[in-house]
Amino acid sequence: MAKTKSKSSKPSSASKSQGGISKLILVLGLLTALLSSVVYFVEQNLEQFYIFDLKHLDDLSKRALAKHGEDTRAVVKHIVDELSEKNPEHVNVKEEWVFNNAGGAMGAMYIIHASVTEYLIIFGTAIGTEGHTGRHTADDYFHILSGTQLAYVPGEYAPEVYPAGSIHHLRRGDVKQYKMPEGCFALEYARGWIPPMLFFGFADGLSSTLDFPTLWDTTRITGREMINNLIKGKL
């Protein structure tokens, strides 16, 4: 009698596929858990990652204004010079101005510092703009250096008015309409989670202006500063 050949016990392609999906789900689950743990830890300890002091920025802005008055270029230089003396490894002293379109508003910015938990920029326009502040994952402080910034929230019948020397604090999660009339510039400082704010900063460029050279410059400078700060141990 001829021997009956036994069928091979190789797993079917369907079984392989199911096994691959299970492994992928497991890996994604582990990565999600790890990322959530890191985010939770950083969230509970955000204060220790900040290198800029709110009181110092306010005092510095006011001293620069008292010394240089309406010479905004000199005011900005005064601020950057002192910041670079205080934090030489984390301050970009090279003035690299780029346009910024966000929330319907348009101005220009100079990135002084960018990291995972903080950014510090000079933002403004010589001809005026207005738009949506965005709803952010960080507290945003506008130290007004020239001109007057206006802000509006639904239900009010009068604007919030922020002249030179004052601070407009946009709290994390809040949203306003804002206006920077002709010749308004501010030292803008954000502290909290910065990466999620980048989507707001890129949205207009990707969906409206399609100004890809400016998007590239913004990405290049922001990425360079964030990576350099990470390498130096600054989140």
From Swiss-Prot:
It is found in: Endoplasmic reticulum membrane. Belongs to the ERG2 family. It comes from the Eukaryota. In Fusarium, the biosynthesis pathway of the sterol precursors leading to the prevalent sterol ergosterol differs from yeast. The ringsystem of lanosterol in S.cerevisiae is firstly demethylised in three enzymatic steps leading to the intermediate zymosterol and secondly a methyl group is added to zymosterol by the sterol 24-C-methyltransferase to form fecosterol. In Fusarium, lanosterol is firstly transmethylated by the sterol 24-C-methyltransferase leading to the intermediate eburicol and secondly demethylated in three steps to form fecosterol. This is C-8 sterol isomerase ERG2. Disruption phenotype: Surprisingly, does not show changed sensitivity to amines and does not lead to depletion of ergosterol. One of its GO terms (biological process) is ergosterol biosynthetic process. It is an enzyme of class 5 (isomerase). Pathway: Steroid metabolism; ergosterol biosynthesis. GO terms for molecular function: isomerase activity. Pfam families: ERG2_Sigma1R. One of its GO terms (cellular component) is endoplasmic reticulum membrane. The chain crosses the membrane at residues 21-41. Its EC number is 5.-.-.-. Its main location: endoplasmic reticulum. Keywords: Endoplasmic reticulum, Isomerase, Lipid biosynthesis, Lipid metabolism, Membrane, Steroid biosynthesis, Steroid metabolism, Sterol biosynthesis, Sterol metabolism, Transmembrane, Transmembrane helix. The third module or late pathway involves the ergosterol synthesis itself through consecutive reactions that mainly occur in the endoplasmic reticulum (ER) membrane. Firstly, the squalene synthase ERG9 catalyzes the condensation of 2 farnesyl pyrophosphate moieties to form squalene, which is the precursor of all steroids. It catalyses: fecosterol = episterol. It is a single-pass membrane protein.
